[in-house]
């Protein structure tokens, strides 16, 4: 992620905390999937933490038919809803990789929920946002601000915890 975007925090500090090497991908590589995939393979990248739009661009343009970055063991994505069709393409090309859906609204630094993907989804299915990370809390509230607890009832997602920006209240 660009350094002026909060998601870069996750990219930078996760590599420092785990002792992994952070590979910076030149922005222009994302417009040419073969060049991007060659780069991932050459650098032996093991973890992708990308926006959904970057993953879907590669799969929709059939980049994975050109070359599969087989060193990738984990794919985490956020920023928008992942289309099940595009996720299945990645899952089929990287069957041993773990896939994780991440969610976090603007007022959260990075993400507040995660959902490990353990199966393939049909096009008509929505991939769940998952459960709250430790130190965070996520609830659904109705139009009156009351917590929604019944399955299938719509509401607004509200979050609280250590990643919430100052001045934002649940």
Annotate the PLM regions.
Residues 30-35, 52-66, 74-97, 135, ...:
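Short gly/Ser/Thr-rich phosphate-binding loop of adenylate-forming enzymes
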């Amino acid at each position: 992620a660009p350094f002026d975007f909060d998601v870069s925090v996750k990219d930078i500090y996760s590599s420092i905390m785990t002792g992994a090497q952070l590979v910076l991908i030149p922005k222009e590589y994302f417009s040419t999937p073969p060049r991007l995939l060659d780069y991932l393979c050459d650098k032996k990248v093991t973890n992708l933490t990308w926006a959904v739009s970057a993953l879907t661009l590669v799969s929709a343009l059939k980049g994975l038919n050109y070359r599969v970055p087989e060193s990738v063991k984990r794919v985490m994505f956020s920023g928008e809803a992942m289309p099940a069709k595009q996720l299945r393409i990645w899952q089929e090309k990287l069957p041993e990789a773990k896939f994780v859906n991440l969610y976090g609204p603007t007022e959260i630094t990075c993400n507040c929920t995660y959902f490990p993907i353990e199966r393939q989804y049909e096009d008509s299915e929505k991939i769940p946002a998952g459960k709250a990370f430790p130190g965070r809390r996520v609830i659904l509230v109705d139009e009156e601000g009351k917590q929604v607890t019944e399955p299938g009832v719509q509401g607004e997602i509200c979050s609280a915890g250590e990643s919430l920006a100052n001045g934002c209240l649940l």
